[in-house]
């Protein structure tokens, strides 16, 4: 049984960033466990032309430690891409490169253990510690006693109840879009449900591939949301202040009920669609509707 100061369950960007920062603090014993064999970030949405919605400064470590060796700038340097990035002239990096950057970092962190599935977690009141049991792909079992837990398992894809029992191979969550994108392009009608960034990117990819000839033959895309509209993400300079350490300290000082009310009203800080994606969709809509022609895309709100 191994005694640990902090155990991370799941290795996504948040726990990977924590592992990277802790690598400069050897006095803190840590381990991070992930059942997947290697780091992969939203592989079903690593679409050509997509970027992060936040500047590259929000990498794994820079905002906490700008001198850290696992920062994005050093990643570029190590891959001989620093000058190309300078000429790229954008704060928003390609999503595929962010995934590659995270995989590069994960391979330099021995405390990140991939292919190790956490099978049981319990709190021992007598020890005032957590007991974590895990098993590797080869069947090797481990047990850890940990003072702290960092849960980073991500969110479960949400499927509407009325679709949960549907077994059609092309009824999928957007997290699997890249796997079925080519098949969807051959469908006469496609419906996309949801009005977040992922849904918008699926719509844009399908819309760009829809030819005028297909539209004339009856092909179409329907974009449906229960929201009142297809809203942009809050990305104003004042809005971004919600992510500063000063605001977080203020937020944590508020009563629990107040924090819940505020959090419930801040959905568009992270749930909306980027201005650029909205603009790209509208531009295609405009061009496709010249001379009253059908664009091939219909939008439905409040459904």
Regions found by a protein language model. Give the residues of each.
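Flavin (primarily FAD) cofactor-binding/catalytic cores of flavoenzymes
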Residues: 1-41, 85-197, 201-303
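N-terminal/domain-start segments enriched in small and hydrophobic, helix-friendly residues
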Residues: 33, 53-58, 66-69, 217-222
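Tryptophan-centered motif/residue detector
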Residues: 41, 45, 72-75, 104
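Glycine-rich phosphate-binding loop and adjoining beta1-alpha1-beta2 segment
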Residues: 42-55, 273
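FAD-binding beta-loop-beta segment adjacent to the flavin cofactor pocket
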Residues: 47, 59-63
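Short, intrinsically disordered/low-complexity patches at protein termini
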Residues: 54-56, 64-66, 246, 255-257
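A conserved beta-strand/loop capping segment in the N-terminal third of enzymes
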Residues: 63-96
């Amino acid at each position: 049984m191994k005694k640990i100061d902090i155990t991370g369950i799941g290795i996504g960007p948040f726990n990977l960033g924590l592992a990277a920062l802790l690598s400069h603090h050897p006095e803190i014993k840590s381990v991070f466990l992930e059942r997947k064999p290697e780091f992969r970030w939203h592989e079903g949405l690593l679409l050509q032309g997509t970027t992060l919605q936040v500047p590259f400064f929000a990498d794994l470590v820079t905002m906490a430690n700008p001198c850290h060796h696992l920062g994005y700038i050093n990643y570029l340097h190590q891959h001989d891409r620093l000058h190309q990035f300078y000429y790229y002239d954008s704060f928003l990096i390609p999503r595929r490169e962010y995934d590659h950057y995270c995989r590069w970092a994960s391979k330099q962190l021995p405390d990140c253990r991939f292919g190790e599935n956490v099978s049981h977690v319990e709190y021992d009141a007598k020890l005032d510690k957590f007991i974590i049991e895990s098993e590797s792909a080869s069947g090797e079992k481990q047990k850890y006693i940990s003072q702290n837990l960092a849960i980073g398992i991500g969110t479960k894809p949400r499927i509407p109840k009325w679709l949960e029992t549907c077994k059609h191979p092309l009824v999928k969550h957007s997290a699997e879009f890249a796997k079925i994108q080519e098949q969807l392009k051959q469908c006469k009608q496609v419906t996309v449900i949801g009005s977040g960034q992922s849904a918008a990117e699926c719509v844009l990819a399908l819309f760009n591939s829809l030819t005028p000839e297909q539209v004339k033959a009856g092909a179409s895309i329907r974009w449906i949301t229960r929201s009142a509209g297809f809203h942009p993400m809050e990305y104003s300079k004042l809005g971004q202040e919600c992510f500063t350490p000063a605001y977080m300290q203020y937020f944590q000082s508020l009563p629990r009920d107040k924090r819940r009310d505020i959090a419930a009203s801040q959905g568009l800080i992270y749930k909306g669609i980027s201005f650029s994606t909205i603009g790209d969709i509208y531009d295609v809509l405009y061009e496709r509707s010249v001379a009253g022609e059908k664009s091939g895309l219909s939008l439905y709100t409040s459904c």
